[in-house]
Amino acid sequence: MIRLAIFSLCTLALAACQTEQRQARPQTPSFYASMAQSGAVVDAAMARDMIGAYRRNNGLGPLTIDPDLQALAEAEAQAMASTDRPSSADAVKSRLSSAGFAAPAANLSAGYHTLAEAFSGWRESPQHNRVLLDRSATRIGIATVYTPNSKYKVYWALVVAADKR
């Protein structure tokens, strides 16, 4: 009986000393984060890294996030959302050229809910893939806008360019 009491006391003492171990929930990588929700912001650094790795695998140089291109991408994504349709890349390229960027290019699309989906779709489209693998590109900007009442839900603007002239 005494052994049982001592064993029980020791067990209780050890249990009291044990710290609670929290099991960390695995965090979803940002390229799988849904942009189809209010307040969602695409991870520009992750986009740069994904596209940069793809470019590196194809013998091309890295990209740098450019604040001016980022602002232009945000404005373009917002413009598409306000008209509820994707824009023409030619108009965006013209604006980028007017802003002093050399060799501008753009991927404008709608309907992808995650960066992973957009990146996959762009790689599968010859026209969009050319933008990802543009040899002269050194700078990048990317943005999304969520529009809950749109058939597309999410508008994407990816812009790349060479350094400013």
Residue ranges, per PLM feature:
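N-terminal secretory signal peptides
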Residues: 39-75, 79
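Sec-dependent bacterial lipoprotein signal peptides
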Residues: 1-15
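Disulfide-stabilized extracellular recognition modules
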Residues: 115-165
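Short, surface-exposed glycine/acidic/tryptophan-bearing loops
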Residues: 70-115
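Surface-exposed patches in mature extracellular/periplasmic domains of secreted proteins
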Residues: 57-71, 84-94, 129-145
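Secreted/periplasmic proteins
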Residues: 33, 46-49, 99, 105-112, ...
